[in-house]
Amino acid sequence: MAEEPIRLTQYSHGAGUGCKISPKVLGTILQSQLDKFIDPNLLVGNETADDAAVYDIGNGIGIISTTDFFMPIVDDPFDFGRIAAANALSDVFAMGGKPIMAIAILGFPVNKLPAEVAQKIVEGGRFACQQAGIALAGGHSIDSPEPIFGLAVTGTVSTEQVKKNASAQAGCELFLTKPLGIGVLTTAEKKGLLKVEHQNLARDVMCQINLIGAQFSQLADVTAMTDVTGFGLLGHLSEICQGSNVRAEVNSAEIHTLDGVKDYIAQGAVPGGTNRNFDSYGHLISAMSDEQKAILCDPQTSGGLLIAVRPQAVEKVQQIAKQANIPLFRVGRLLEADTMKPLIEVI
């Protein structure tokens, strides 16, 4: 009798970026009674919820440093490693930089799962690093109750091309490079609702590395860029709005989702992270339908890049995406701040 295949998602209580601590709780954790340490060379810290830290080392060069890790969102070990690595690498591209090396972060239940499973996870991470043109140069591992994997990534960026949450401008158009609904599809799979024709849809999107960010960063008219992950589209957009003192309009009719997402929402395949996200920033958003909330607050894992583009550069950005065979979905626009209106208006 053949052994049952190992299903990694059965060994964790959370999945992918849905494991992230909610924005509200994270805000409490990051409060400090200590005087702020001022370093004039630290160009980007954690004040504006950016994707990575950036340090000026001189001669117009910034060093990017970031880390990201989570529990399995798929059952296959190799795919889990690929997705976790792609997700971590994305932070560097979202800042407008290029990665130069990575080290692995591995937590593994050595008494529950064979070492060969961990080997496949790391191999998946190594594969993604090679796709990004860098080495997986080392790492650290611990014995943990649940599988955890991710990377700490180092990158470089021109200090004049850093894309910050605080640099967006009113009048910019908003674009996203991947469809939404990853959290919904992975939840549908856990619930046994996923149709055969929708298998691997989410996996394939999560494995795509956001290499295109390095090209977008060359354009001064791309004023801000971030990746959409565990806080959902509205959560990460709210970080841009708050950091840049602007507000946003999101056109729900223009939002692209993975096939089947709306049907699975109707069947109750909404991850717990969706409500945690809404509880954290829902007061900043205009009224939405339940379906809109389930899509726009859906926690993404290795999601797309959200970019703010001045109108005169929209055609150029679309051309870059087309040449790279990357989808580019218009999702809304940025407007002048107005304290009498919601930070983000969903229409």
Swiss-Prot record:
Its cofactor is Mg(2+). GO terms for molecular function: ATP binding; magnesium ion binding; selenide, water dikinase activity. It catalyses: hydrogenselenide + ATP + H2O = selenophosphate + AMP + phosphate + 2 H(+). ATP binds at K20, T48, A49, D50, D68, D91, G139, H140, S141. Keywords: ATP-binding, Kinase, Magnesium, Metal-binding, Nucleotide-binding, Selenium, Selenocysteine, Transferase. Homodimer. This is Selenide, water dikinase. It comes from Actinobacillus pleuropneumoniae serotype 5b (strain L20). The gene is selD.
